[in-house]
A protein has these predicted regions:
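Active-site gating loops and adjacent loop-to-helix segments of metal-dependent hydrolytic enzymes
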Residues: 1-23, 64-89, 225-228
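Short, acidic/turn-prone active-site loops that include or flank metal/cofactor-
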Residues: 3, 120, 176-180
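Active-site mouth loops of central-metabolism enzymes
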Residues: 18-35, 93
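Divalent metal-binding pocket/active-site signature
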Residues: 31, 46-160
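Short alpha-helical segments and helix-capping/turn motifs at coil-helix boundaries
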Residues: 33-42, 46
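Aromatic/hydrophobic pocket-lining residues that form the small-molecule binding cavity
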Residues: 36, 96, 100, 186
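Residue-level signal for alpha-helix termini/capping positions
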Residues: 44-45, 108, 166, 198
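H/E-rich (His + Asp/Glu) clusters that bind or coordinate divalent metals
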Residues: 135-138, 143-237
Length: 237
């Protein structure tokens, strides 16, 4: 379930578009939260196994904990003018951050893990501080009943990932994509992980390629298979 599109809503029209699959319209923050809850339940019913948040491509992951009043003020401003769009990221941030926390509580209630993009960013999308997992420790502590998976082996910050997976019962490490990014890093990190972290919290393989539709937007099952071969070879060395 792709989370950013639901908590980074910037305009009246974006919000209404999220409610359209239910043939509903939205005028209040409560109505929007209810729409998202119904949609997320539907995702799970039809086979979704996790939430995924790749917000690191667009912002730093230092989510504040704004009040509902602050978030509702931004939301109501968008509702007051169908042509208005909130400035990003600063003007939108109270709503963005509030919704993110609300959706984590929904993930808890649906008993679905939350996958967070950490570490390397594809392309030139870059600032190191955007995707580093270590500053997220407060988030893992606040939402202790939510299961988090930290993606891409937090490359290149392996030590911090080991600490988070060992120190927080609700955090697991996931090597998806990492075997293609840096095989030697993965070998070294795995050696440390098997001696320092409970084995059930180490997911040694994953490939988060889209599997739906036709290329270029999806249909990448072959790439997931290829990544599996890389991971198998890499872990066998």
């Amino acid at each position: 379930i792709p989370l950013p599109g639901y908590h980074q809503v910037r305009s009246f029209m974006e919000i209404q578009a999220k409610a359209a699959p239910l043939n509903r319209s939205v005028s209040t923050l409560d109505e929007y939260l209810d729409v998202c809850w119904v949609i997320f339940q539907g995702f799970k019913k039809f086979g979704a196994v996790a939430f995924k948040d790749q917000s690191a491509y667009f912002r730093t992951l230092d989510y504040s904990n704004p009040t509902r009043d602050d978030a509702e003020r931004v939301f109501n401003r968008l509702m007051a003018d169908g042509l208005r769009s909130a400035g990003y990221p600063d003007e939108l941030r109270p709503l963005d951050d509030y919704l993110f926390h609300a959706f984590l509580r929904m993930a808890r209630d649906l008993d679905l893990p939350v996958q967070l993009h950490t570490g390397h960013l594809a392309g030139l999308s870059g600032a190191l501080r955007k995707a580093h997992a270590a500053p997220r420790a407060d988030l893992f502590l606040l939402h202790r009943d939510v299961r988090f998976e930290l993606f891409h082996a937090n490359w290149p910050h392996g030590g911090e990932l080991l600490f988070l997976a060992k120190a927080f019962p609700n955090v697991v490490m996931n090597f998806c994509w990492a075997h293609a990014i840096d095989p030697i890093y993965c070998q070294a990190l795995m050696r440390e992980a098997v001696s320092a972290v409970p084995h059930a919290k180490v997911h040694a393989f994953g490939a988060d390629y889209g599997g739906f539709g036709l290329p270029p937007g999806g249909g990448y099952v072959d790439r997931a298979w290829a990544h599996l071969q890389l991971a198998l070879d890499n872990m066998a060395i």
